[in-house]
Amino acid sequence: MCGIIGIIGREDLSERLFQGLRRLEYRGYDSAGMCTIHDGKLDRRRAEGKLDNLGRVLANDPLPGKIGIAHTRWATHGAPTVANAHPHIAGDVAVVHNGIIENFKTLRDELLERGHHFESETDTEVVAHLLDEQMQAGKDPRHAVSKVLKKLRGAFALAILFKNYPDLLIGARLGSPLVVGYGDGENYLGSDALALAPLTQKISYLEEGDWVVLTREGIEVHDIEDRIVERPVVLSGASGLMVEKGNYRHFMQKEIFEQPVVVAQTLQSYLRPVEGQVALPDPDFDLSQIKRVTIVACGTSYYAGMVARYWIERFARVPVEIEAASEYRYREPVMEEGGLSLFISQSGETADTLAALRHARAGGQKIAVVVNVPTSSMAREADLLLPTHAGPEIGVASTKAFTCQLAVLAALATHIARVKGQLTQQEEQDIVRHLAEAPAALNAALAFNDTIENVATAIAPARDVLYIGRGPDYPLAMEGALKLKEISYIHAEGYAAGEMKHGPIALIDDKVPIIVLAPSGPLFEKTVSNMQEMQARGGKVILISDEKGIQEAGDNCLATLTMPKVHPLIAPIVYAIPVQLLAYHVAVIKGTDVDQPRNLAKSVTVE
């Protein structure tokens, strides 16, 4: 959600700023812009829409300069127009900003009363005016930034240029991530390590409330109390190759097909197949004393949490609640002693989830996190860090991060069950064996790609689509519906199969495809009964099951998709493949922007 890159160096850097924005495209955006200091003035270029539009602006009107900031904007305040695109300039100050300034209206009204005039509808322009006001009052950039930061409420990451200080680039963060990079005679700011990947591998993650002064010679970090502090310098490991599609048409397609490998990599960190054991990192607390688990997440991660609830309650016999992160803090949840709060996030920076984590921490809960970015804010604040190893996920619609989350959550459920004495050694060995089978089963599921592509032609014309499942397949139904909504823009809903007769069955007619997730097993017969109720009312069913299930129930279906026969434990991991591929192929047929669907952002860093 929005992206920032800033460079201070000794050579013209317009092209490097632009390529940095390319690496930030995956975060989602609807406009973009850049600003440098050149010949004693702030020089800016902006464009609405895709980066190619900004590229054309730069081709017609190049942007020289040896210090600059650049930004991709995902609209929060004001429409996605050129006037609202960043950077924003007020007098001698240029600013780019990720996040939301919650008290911007109050600040704006005060500035208007003092005679300021605004060119945009954004909250960001308020920051530029406040800083310029301080500069006009005789403050230097450091004092101006320190004073203005204390007036801002909300979540933000900022990069700031001062026209009369071409040897100074300032950044700040509170509730939104910002990384600094160390170069040779130049230094960098970025929203994440990927933005800086080809420029440097030496980075520092700023902490909450930090602000930083970059010169060509060095970097000076200040904490929230304005004290100069040191932040650890680490090697990022990020590579520009991570944001290339290779031979695939879309990043989403590439990431779907990477799942056998990345799930295997993830499981390798948590399974000891020879011993038949799950091995988790040692937490800072005793997991055997946990009395309740509260899972908190958003979007696809929330559905991974729903699956985990089945596993934890079944194996560990510990009660589990699951909460939407955006709602968690606002219902005054009861936090009992002995509670574990489990937070799931691909980026580890999701604003709602991070705020919920801090709320749970304040309530005395132990904190575990499942994240794909082990250097993220959530990772740094956890008592138990459980990283996935999916690698960077560029497509906005999550695919490989989801299946890796499921792999980690299955391992966690097994570990809790063992330390609480709920599993025999043989039962744990069986679970480990079945989890180890998941990568091969994912490969087998991907082999049906062509068949799934053909079935997608029956879904693409639909206005509405329903997904149903039972047990752990119910969250998969909801995830499948979300995927279709996200990238094809078709209205879709996921339901527990048994709930259809309690209202949603009224939607059934011959124009509404119904995707049924029903691997053969204990819940198969009941799911098929629900499916047949819909067929009796003209519903056009696409049944996803294994060979046995298709033989038993596939005769009257519009189409069937045969998945490999797998143990029920790993069915949610394997059955993610067909719902992801269905959504992908429908979106391709409809010609939508698969990797950057409208109105969506990869990392939602505002509440």
UniProtKB/Swiss-Prot annotation:
Record carries keyword Cytoplasm: yes
Catalytic activity of the protein: D-fructose 6-phosphate + L-glutamine = D-glucosamine 6-phosphate + L-glutamate
Catalytic residue list: C2 (nucleophile), K602 (for fru-6p isomerization activity)
Enzyme Commission code: 2.6.1.16
Annotated Glutamine amidotransferase type-2 domain residues: 2-217
Gene Ontology terms: cellular component: cytosol
Keywords annotated in UniProt: Aminotransferase, Cytoplasm, Glutamine amidotransferase, Repeat, Transferase
Main location: cytoplasm
Domain (SIS) ranges: 283-422, 455-597
InterPro entries noted in UniProt: GATase_2_dom, GFAT, GFAT_N, GlmS/AgaS_SIS, GlmS/FrlB_SIS, Ntn_hydrolases_N, SIS_dom, SIS_dom_sf
Domain of life: Bacteria
Entry-linked CDD domains: GFAT, SIS_GlmS_GlmD_1, SIS_GlmS_GlmD_2
Gene3D superfamilies, A to Z: Glucose-6-phosphate isomerase like protein, domain 1, Glutamine Phosphoribosylpyrophosphate, subunit 1, domain 1
Location(s), subcellular: Cytoplasm
GO molecular function: carbohydrate derivative binding; glutamine-fructose-6-phosphate transaminase (isomerizing) activity
Any single GO BP term: UDP-N-acetylglucosamine metabolic process
Listed HAMAP family: GlmS
Function as written in the Swiss-Prot or TrEMBL entry: Catalyzes the first step in hexosamine metabolism, converting fructose-6P into glucosamine-6P using glutamine as a nitrogen source.
Assembly and oligomerization: Homodimer.
Protein name per UniProt: Glutamine--fructose-6-phosphate aminotransferase [isomerizing]
The gene coding this protein: glmS
